């Protein structure tokens, strides 16, 4: 693929940082090399000397001596080598990307670690979006992505979707305003990429089926656009077998996949990873070299030690426990909604993730209801207009998260909300 046509002038202009290059060399160099190159501080002046973390199974992860010094030091902009290796093998096991054995020029799969999935997404958007570019999205969409893209000046086209995600026929109709060959003409403003959360979409909780993904991928091939597969809830799918991913069917090297460990290991450690064609991953890393320099070394080492301790089977067993927890939480909030909101509101059963998307009947705009009156009754929810490109337009929806609240709290919130809806109707 010709990736240069997708890149912004800023991204094309990025060059390797000479100082960061020495860090990459040091990460692969033999231990006896004497380096006066990097401006790394001497760990003797660091006040922290050791750390011990206790895992839920009672085992420990211990940092001391050289290992702890390394944890407190600068590291590779790609991510630490051992974590990169572990995550690459995980991607191969879970997705078996067709591009694994491609040459770099053909779109060979590569991977880099980012400071959380959001950091990776922002770098992807800044790599791809010029002012005036056309971007495909399915509304409602994740507000973090929406507000990262908006300042870059792109033109959004919303693709029809339902409780099974993007509707391929709707996407086909949107694309019919162009001819496939128009992608070779920059003045035609053909779509540069499709952005979507395929599993447990934030805020709707819906998931895209494998069959629909295949149809969408073929349309991406026909009209030559990229697919940004933002999948932070991949490990929170409530039914098995899990649906195949866009990455698993990417024969062209046109999928950029964003993964997160926030939902199953820790959100505060800020470790995510981006998988995609090598030439695009390199562009993301060049951005990291001059922004944050690298993801947090201590966070990466903590997660790496844990993953190697668990192994793939142990990690996936932990994922299954997380799924069981969130599935129970989902069932609790559905029971509370059915008890108090039946007849007052409508919702679909989330297939993954941690959100329930609710439409209030008989109210055209729930913004004031949620932002003012609900808070007066000591309940906090997110109004639906936050998840639309035109967030000034009225929306009768709101988002409820079921990740942290107890069943009793869910019941109380919906009891208060039901009374509030009745009061204003």
Swiss-Prot record:
Pathway membership: Amino-acid degradation; L-lysine degradation via saccharopine pathway; glutaryl-CoA from L-lysine: step 4/6
Keyword vocabulary terms for this entry: Acetylation, Aminotransferase, Mitochondrion, Phosphoprotein, Pyridoxal phosphate, Transferase, Transit peptide
Class in the EC hierarchy, top level: transferase
Ligand binding (substrate): 20, 74, 142, 202, 399
Residues with the N6-(pyridoxal phosphate)lysine modification: 263
Keyword Transport tagged: no
Required cofactor(s): pyridoxal 5'-phosphate
An annotated GO BP: 2-oxoglutarate metabolic process
Record's GO cellular component terms: cytosol; mitochondrial matrix
Pfam families in the record: Aminotran_1_2
Positions carrying N6-acetyllysine: 179, 263, 339, 351, 367, 422
PTM field: The N-terminus is blocked.
Catalytic activity: L-kynurenine + 2-oxoglutarate = kynurenate + L-glutamate + H2O; L-2-aminoadipate + 2-oxoglutarate = 2-oxoadipate + L-glutamate; glycine + 2-oxoglutarate = glyoxylate + L-glutamate; L-kynurenine + glyoxylate = kynurenate + glycine + H2O
Positions bearing Phosphoserine: 40
Subcellular location: Mitochondrion
InterPro entries the UniProt entry points to: Aminotransferase_I/II_large, Class-I_PLP-dep_aminotransf, PyrdxlP-dep_Trfase, PyrdxlP-dep_Trfase_major
Major location (coarse): mitochondrion
Transit peptide region: 1-29
Residues where N6-succinyllysine is found: 172, 263, 339, 367
Biased composition regions of type Basic and acidic residues, renumbered to the chain: 179-188
Quaternary context: Homodimer.
Protein family per UniProt: Belongs to the class-I pyridoxal-phosphate-dependent aminotransferase family.
Role according to the record: Transaminase with broad substrate specificity. Has transaminase activity towards aminoadipate, kynurenine, methionine and glutamate. Shows activity also towards tryptophan, aspartate and hydroxykynurenine. Accepts a variety of oxo-acids as amino-group acceptors, with a preference for 2-oxoglutarate, 2-oxocaproic acid, phenylpyruvate and alpha-oxo-gamma-methiol butyric acid. Can also use glyoxylate as amino-group acceptor (in vitro).
This protein's name: Kynurenine/alpha-aminoadipate aminotransferase, mitochondrial
Name of the encoding gene: Aadat
């Amino acid at each position: 693929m010709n990736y240069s046509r997708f890149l912004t002038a800023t991204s094309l202009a990025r060059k390797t940082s000479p100082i960061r290059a020495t860090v990459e060399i040091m990460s692969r160099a033999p231990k006896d090399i004497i380096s006066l190159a990097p401006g790394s501080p001497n760990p003797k002046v660091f006040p922290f000397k050791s750390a011990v973390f206790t895992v839920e199974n009672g085992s420990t992860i211990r940092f001391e001596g050289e290992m702890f010094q390394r944890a407190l030091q600068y590291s590779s902009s790609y991510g630490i080598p051992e974590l990169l290796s572990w995550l690459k093998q995980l991607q191969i096991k879970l997705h078996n990307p067709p591009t694994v054995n491609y040459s770099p020029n053909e779109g060979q799969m590569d991977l880099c670690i980012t400071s959380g999935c959001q950091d990776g997404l922002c770098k992807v958007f800044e790599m791809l979006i010029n002012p005036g570019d056309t971007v495909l999205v399915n509304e409602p969409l994740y507000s973090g992505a929406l507000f990262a893209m908006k300042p870059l000046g792109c033109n959004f086209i919303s693709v029809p979707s339902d409780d099974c995600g993007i509707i391929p026929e709707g996407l086909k109709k949107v694309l019919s305003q162009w001819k496939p060959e128009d992608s070779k003409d920059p003045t035609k403003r053909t779509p540069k990429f499709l952005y979507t959360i395929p599993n447990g979409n934030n805020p709707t909780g819906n998931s895209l089926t494998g069959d629909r993904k295949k149809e969408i991928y073929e349309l991406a091939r026909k009209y030559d656009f990229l697919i940004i597969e933002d999948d932070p809830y991949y490990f929170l799918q409530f039914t098995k077998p899990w649906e195949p991913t866009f990455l698993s069917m990417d024969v062209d090297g046109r999928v950029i996949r964003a993964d997160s460990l926030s939902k199953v290991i820790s959100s505060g450690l800020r470790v995510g990873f981006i998988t995609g064609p090598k030439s695009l991953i390199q562009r993301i890393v060049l951005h990291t070299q001059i922004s944050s320099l690298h993801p947090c070394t201590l966070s990466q080492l903590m997660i790496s030690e844990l993953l190697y301790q668990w192994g793939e089977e142990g990690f996936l067993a932990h994922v299954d426990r997380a799924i069981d927890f969130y599935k129970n939480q989902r069932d609790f909030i559905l029971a509370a909604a059915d008890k108090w909101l039946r007849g007052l509101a409508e919702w679909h059963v989330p297939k993954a993730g941690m959100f329930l998307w609710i439409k209030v009947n008989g109210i055209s705009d729930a913004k004031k209801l949620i932002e003012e009156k609900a808070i007066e009754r000591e309940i906090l929810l997110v109004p639906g207009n936050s998840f639309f490109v035109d967030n000034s337009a009225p929306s009768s929806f709101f988002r409820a998260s079921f990740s942290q609240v107890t069943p009793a709290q869910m019941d109380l919130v919906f009891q208060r909300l039901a009374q509030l809806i009745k009061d204003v109707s």
